Amino acid sequence: MNVKGKVILSMLVVSTVIVVFWEYINSPEGSFLWIYHSKNPEVDDSSAQKGWWFPGWFNNGIHNYQQEEEDTDKEKGREEEQRKEDDTTELRLWDWFNPKKRPEVVTVTKWKAPVVWEGTYNKAILENYYAKQKITVGLTVFAIGRYIEHYLEEFVTSANRYFMVGHKVIFYVMVDDVSKVPFIELGPLRSFKVFEVKPEKRWQDISMMRMKTIGEHILAHIQHEVDFLFCMDVDQVFQDHFGVETLGQSVAQLQAWWYKADPDDFTYERRKESAAYIPFGQGDFYYHAAIFGGTPIQVLNITQECFKGILLDKKNDIEAEWHDESHLNEYFLLNKPSKILSPEYCWDYHIGLPSDIKTVKLSWQTKEYNLVRNKV
């Protein structure tokens, strides 16, 4: 082939390449669709069956890779949604509570609330659930006058060791003399808030006025700081783990001396003139005011209603037999607690240790009333 022929041939090749390239970059699908046309009359230029093997393979490769990424993202999304759902799913009673484990005692009330005894709850399930919730639990305690020096340090020290281990805890300590509060070193996740309260002339008024004080603190700050709140007497000491099995909307404590007695034998307030009045023939259990709790809003309602009854009695010049405890029992008769704690959670060793008390969680201190209630 002469030189002129070679030049013409080269120009034809270059022109062909340019045309091919121009068709490629202007193709809406980004491939060599316009090079290959099917001879099948049923397949027109816009058919997905048109194409060249290399760009078709390349595009399919990209498509498959992108599809895999999309599938992976969707799967991750589903897993994240499932995780969030698992974290927020309400824990059902029968997921963690087995009343048949303690057939010798009352484990379920007439209104289907659990009575928590050692052995009836699955600690692992409860801990797993509440750990995901990242809860904070509050604990209020009053130490007035000599109660500070006789009981406060041992109460808080034992609570630091056994109360809601592994979860955030705020101790709300109410005293009449901040200068007497001992230094107590707390563990991780624990904090200590001290508040000075006005002292009362009589110990009965101290006991009753705590309902007003707790309610005021819940409204002022506690409701924004904790998920659950317990209110306890200071003359007690923790003996074993007092954990998340005790948490609930409203929680009442069985009184150790009365948990086997007939309701007509309970020391309820029996005078009709009192706002705490409970007639014979009524009553479920006798509840101990040394421990009660629940969500902040429920505890607020408990304290406000009890204090209303106390004020009404004062107006009528009457005082309930067991003061705030009488009003608490009247409240729980009308507003059934969602959970009840067995006497194991507040035991008096003076009773002895019967076979149904498996593990004492919290015990009464020796009541030195002549000492601590003399000019408190």
From Swiss-Prot:
Database matches in Pfam families: Glyco_transf_6 (PF03414)
Organism listed in the record: Callithrix jacchus (White-tufted-ear marmoset)
Sorted UniProt keywords: Glycoprotein, Glycosyltransferase, Golgi apparatus, Manganese, Membrane, Metal-binding, Signal-anchor, Transferase, Transmembrane, Transmembrane helix
Transmembrane regions listed in the UniProt entry: 7-27
Known catalytic reactions: a beta-D-galactosyl-(1->4)-N-acetyl-beta-D-glucosaminyl derivative + UDP-alpha-D-galactose = an alpha-D-galactosyl-(1->3)-beta-D-galactosyl-(1->4)-N-acetyl-beta-D-glucosaminyl derivative + UDP + H(+)
Residue spans, topological domain Lumenal: 28-376
Stretches assigned to the Cytoplasmic side: 1-6
Annotated protein name in UniProt: N-acetyllactosaminide alpha-1,3-galactosyltransferase
Cofactor(s) this protein requires: Mn(2+)
The keyword Transmembrane appears for this protein: yes
Protein's cellular compartments: Golgi apparatus, Golgi stack membrane
